[in-house]
Amino acid sequence: MGGNLKNIKRQISSTKNTQKTTKAMKLVSSSKLKKAEELARRSKVYAKQLSAVFHDVVAKIRVRGLDNINSRYFAKSEGREIKKLDIIFITADKGLCGGFNITTIKEVLRLMETYKQQGIKVRLRGIGKTGISFFAFNDIEVLDKAIGLSAAPTFEKAEAFIENVVEDFLNGATDEVIIVHNGFKNMISQELESQAILPLTINIKQNEQPSVLNIEPEDEENIILDELAKKYVQYNMYYALVDSLAAEHSARIQAMDAATNNAGDLVKSLTISLNKARQEAITTELVEINAGAEAIK
């Protein structure tokens, strides 16, 4: 009986230590989430402004009768055939964040199978140790690998990562590029995002007039459009990273909160078991004492 009591006490002590760890991890992620959420908010504002300028340049070109936009970043035709496609996936470098990583991985696997059935060759480019390790374990090739980027994204790092992807697209090595990641929705939920970032498509209403820029002459418009297109793709990559980071911390807060609560419930359950074991030990001792007393009589 004594051994059982010691075992339960050890379990209680171990569970309490785990509870302290998960609680601390929740607090750390809560602090990081505030920073990541603010970064995502500011990035979204900039992305909208960039998109507005981008639309304005395209609208100006079309208003002047230049329907043939001279930029390699745009789709040449709506019904173009896709034979080769690149998927960029973003996962965390670490686990302990619920279904955050596996949701992205499952979506990538689903897309790979879907495109395979359509006869489209798919290549992977990975950000985040968890996803990269998963595909390596399953002997699935990942072309470009970035560990540490999803945990500390900067525009410069995003720009460097997407450089090879853009070059492959412009050289015809791939026909389309998709980013798959978990996006931040709110404090308690994340939303799976699957976005095509290349080629660019832009919807301009027939009579839409440009309002932001005053660019001359026509050649300059196309030069600016090409530079804007490149920056637009780079910033989409950066925003996906920032959005994913906020979602990661949100998921980790939920996971650590659930783990902390579960540990608390387990401690309560073990404490009840400990008290029962103590009562049984006391009862056994009393029975043995009474039995001894009766034997003496």
Curated annotation (Swiss-Prot):
<dbReference type="GO" id="GO:0045259">
    <property type="term" value="C:proton-transporting ATP synthase complex"/>
</dbReference>
<dbReference type="InterPro" id="IPR023632">
    <property type="entry name" value="ATP_synth_F1_gsu_CS"/>
</dbReference>
<keyword id="KW-0813">Transport</keyword>
<comment type="function">
    <text>Produces ATP from ADP in the presence of a proton gradient across the membrane. The gamma chain is believed to be important in regulating ATPase activity and the flow of protons through the CF(0) complex.</text>
</comment>
<keyword id="KW-0406">Ion transport</keyword>
<keyword id="KW-0139">CF(1)</keyword>
<feature type="compositionally biased region" description="Polar residues">
    <location>
        <begin position="10"/>
        <end position="22"/>
    </location>
</feature>
<feature type="region of interest" description="Disordered">
    <location>
        <begin position="1"/>
        <end position="23"/>
    </location>
</feature>
<dbReference type="GO" id="GO:0005524">
    <property type="term" value="F:ATP binding"/>
</dbReference>
<dbReference type="GO" id="GO:0042777">
    <property type="term" value="P:proton motive force-driven plasma membrane ATP synthesis"/>
</dbReference>
<comment type="similarity">
    <text>Belongs to the ATPase gamma chain family.</text>
</comment>
<dbReference type="GO" id="GO:0005886">
    <property type="term" value="C:plasma membrane"/>
</dbReference>
<keyword id="KW-1003">Cell membrane</keyword>
<keyword id="KW-0472">Membrane</keyword>
<dbReference type="InterPro" id="IPR035968">
    <property type="entry name" value="ATP_synth_F1_ATPase_gsu"/>
</dbReference>
<keyword id="KW-0066">ATP synthesis</keyword>
<keyword id="KW-0997">Cell inner membrane</keyword>
<protein>
    <recommendedName>
        <fullName>ATP synthase gamma chain</fullName>
    </recommendedName>
</protein>
<comment type="subunit">
    <text>F-type ATPases have 2 components, CF(1) - the catalytic core - and CF(0) - the membrane proton channel. CF(1) has five subunits: alpha(3), beta(3), gamma(1), delta(1), epsilon(1). CF(0) has three main subunits: a, b and c.</text>
</comment>
<dbReference type="Pfam" id="PF00231">
    <property type="entry name" value="ATP-synt"/>
</dbReference>
<keyword id="KW-0375">Hydrogen ion transport</keyword>
<dbReference type="GO" id="GO:0046933">
    <property type="term" value="F:proton-transporting ATP synthase activity, rotational mechanism"/>
</dbReference>
<dbReference type="InterPro" id="IPR000131">
    <property type="entry name" value="ATP_synth_F1_gsu"/>
</dbReference>
